[in-house]
Amino acid sequence: MSLNDFLSSVLPVSEQFEYLSLQSIPLETHAVVTPNKDDKRVPKSTIKTQHFFSLFHQGKVFFSLEVYVYVTLWDEADAERLIFVSKADTNGYCNTRVSVRDITKIILEFILSIDPNYYLQKVKPAIRSYKKISPELISAASTPARTLRILARRLKQSGSTVLKEIESPRFQQDLYLSFTCPREILTKICLFTRPASQYLFPDSSKNSKKHILNGEELMKWWGFILDRLLIECFQNDTQAKLRIPGEDPARVRSYLRGMKYPLWQVGDIFTSKENSLAVYNIPLFPDDPKARFIHQLAEEDRLLKVSLSSFWIELQERQEFKLSVTSSVMGISGYSLATPSLFPSSADVIVPKSRKQFRAIKKYITGEEYDTEEGAIEAFTNIRDFLLLRMATNLQSLTGKREHRERNQPVPASNINTLAITMLKPRKKAKALPKT
């Protein structure tokens, strides 16, 4: 299935939408979790890829989602994939009824369907060895004189200073790394929930039509999405964890009673033992409060002194947790039911040529002001024009296919859940007829 197929299945029938699906060039990066020097199992490489999705309706952006995918290679036969959900946001400027929860879930399903090898074909190395690249290429190590000689040679040979063969395999192997891994690998999804008036659409909270969730509502909203993914996309022995820093475990378990998946537990998917050091267990994600606290511990020279149990206690005392709102850490860890096999096409993702260009395109969404509808319109217009004029491509269009069912419309008999029937409240006793 293409991204178009995934999205159209949850968008209202006959309604027209456009979508932006940005993907960064996969980058070799540091390990997600700092390895202990005593660990016998140390990652060989970690590849990070950023996804940014936006949906448009009637010439206005109304939804965006930011996700990072990490593929950790332990060796040629062992790897794992970690999907970090960074931010999701709406601005209230959609003129038709849509389920943002279902849109978010279906995009995560799309990411889960991607073969992890897709991210490993063309990886920008953390450090490039310029001494080993072809002398025909201009690099950061090229002197001005050498650069001029290369440009003059290109101009003489092809009439242009642009190297048209830059995408050929002989040059790509000089510039990028490539790896392989099994398709069936351990998959983790994790996220941090903390309520805010806006995440990706500045000033959108000033729009009275925007629906803003409080901490408990937001946690339940994401919990529903992960719970559905567990049931529909993961094997039945998958781990599922919820941690609310500073909250009593009994209270956390009360939230888990509403989950359909039976193996939810209190805790997080990264903790092995509570008395082990936090630095060797806490993941380092972009713009994440847990990672910020780890960096603070490094500045205070306390990395080798704070255990996991102390980490969670101290974390709740930080300013971003002291607002009397519910914040949580959620995660699942297991194997997919279906083997990921999708290699996204150019219709599924747009891959800018550099991180700078990726950020510039994303900025057209996140840099607008959404206190009025004009911001949503400007974002759509700027994205559309940039893609057309600078990248010779377009936003992808789709037509929704989901039929809307009124609340009082009966569910077809074939789809009725018999378990739900047995759980209906008992019928009240009929009042006795008056005696005559």
Swiss-Prot record:
Source organism (scientific name): Saccharomyces cerevisiae (strain ATCC 204508 / S288c)
Field pH dependence: Optimum pH is >8.5.
Effect of residue 285 to A: Increases sensitivity to methyl methane sulfonate, camptothecin and hydroxyurea (genotoxic stress)
An example Gene Ontology molecular-function term: histone H3K23 acetyltransferase activity
Consequence the record notes for mutating residue 290 to R: Normal histone acetylase activity. Increases sensitivity to methyl methane sulfonate, camptothecin and hydroxyurea (genotoxic stress)
Induction and repression of expression: Expression peaks in cell cycle G1.
GO terms classed as biological process: cellular response to stress; DNA damage response; maintenance of rDNA; nucleosome assembly; protein modification process; regulation of double-strand break repair via nonhomologous end joining; regulation of gene expression; regulation of transcription by RNA polymerase II
Substitution effect: residue 287 to A: Increases sensitivity to methyl methane sulfonate, camptothecin and hydroxyurea (genotoxic stress)
Encoding gene per record: RTT109
Rtt109-type HAT domain segment(s): 2-404
Top-level EC class: transferase
Stated consequence of mutating residue 89 to A: Abolishes histone acetylase activity
Residue pairs linked by disulfide bridges in the UniProt entry: none
Sequence segments annotated as region (Interaction with VPS75): 128-170
One cellular component (GO) term of this entry: chromatin
Localization per record: Nucleus
Misc: Present with 1140 molecules/cell in log phase SD medium.
Family: Belongs to the RTT109 family.
Protein name as annotated: Histone acetyltransferase RTT109
Residue numbers spanned by region Interaction with ASF1: 419-433
Record note on quaternary structure: Forms a complex composed of two RTT109 subunits and one VPS75 homodimer; each RTT109 subunit interacts predominantly with VPS75 instead of interacting with the other RTT109 subunit. Interacts with VPS75; the interaction is direct. Interacts (via C-terminus) with ASF1; the interaction is direct. Interacts with histone H3/H4 heterodimers via histone H3.
Binding residues for acetyl-CoA: 88-90, 97-101, 192, 196, 211-213, 221
